[in-house]
Amino acid sequence: MDSLSVIIVGLLVMFWAGVIQGLTGFGFALVSVPIMTIFLSPKKTIPIVLLHAILIVIVILYEARKWVDLKRIWPLMIAGIVGMPFGTYLLIFLKASTLKVLIGSVIVLFTLALLKGFKRKIKSEKLAFAPVGFISGLLAGSTMMGGPPVILFFTNQGLNKNVFRANLVCYFATLSLATIPAYIAGGLITKEVIKYAVLLLPAMICGGITGIKLAHIVQEQLFKKIVLIILIVAGLMSIASGFGLW
């Protein structure tokens, strides 16, 4: 596909991904990575998504800051940062098709757990945050999809919509900023990546603003359904792409 076609598709994808991120507090990478890797390699797509994700989560974090509970989630953020460099190593050395299947499989597995109503109240959150954060960081570094483990954990703990969204974007902002040095060191932030990131930026901004506005009017039950639908569709698309079916 030529550059112009990639940009046109990218504008549509980034707008929709921005809407989802603004609405739910997550989903930017879950929506954009599976589709964009059909047209660009993961080694180009994932750094582009990272640069956009940093901007949008910071904006959402400012809007949702009053619901953030740093005392609760700081162990999660530290564990995520520790896992992230290992994920970056996987991104550099794994084949594109392998990464796509890995991305999709992780998403689908976690979504099925949510659909099955998997729930087990965990009293010692700080201890549980260590493995959850590390796995999330590993996935974030390799696929920019570190959300599913944390989303499942927060859902399991019964957080309401506003707290769920605020703590999630706070975690993502921290992890995304920590990922930048590893990507630079790995040679993943190239001139081509920056070019695409700049060209697609307006669509992401418009989508993010739209999503933030929708977040104030969408009811809790509809919010949860949207989350599950996004997860399952994105996961299946990524697997299909990895096997050459998409």
Which residues are covered by each model-predicted region?
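Small-residue-enriched transmembrane helix starts and helix-helix packing motifs
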Residues: 1-20, 124-138
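Small-residue-rich hydrophobic segments that form or flank transmembrane alpha-helices
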Residues: 7-74, 147-205
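Residues within membrane-spanning alpha-helices of integral membrane proteins
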Residues: 11, 50, 103-107, 111, ...
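Small-residue-mediated transmembrane helix hinge/kink sites in multi-pass secondary transporters
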Residues: 34, 88-92, 152, 212
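Membrane helix-loop-helix hairpins that form the core translocation module of multi-pass transporters
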Residues: 43-116
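Hydrophobic alpha-helical transmembrane segments in multi-pass integral membrane proteins
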Residues: 91, 96, 100, 140-145, ...
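Interfacial loop-to-transmembrane junctions
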Residues: 209-232
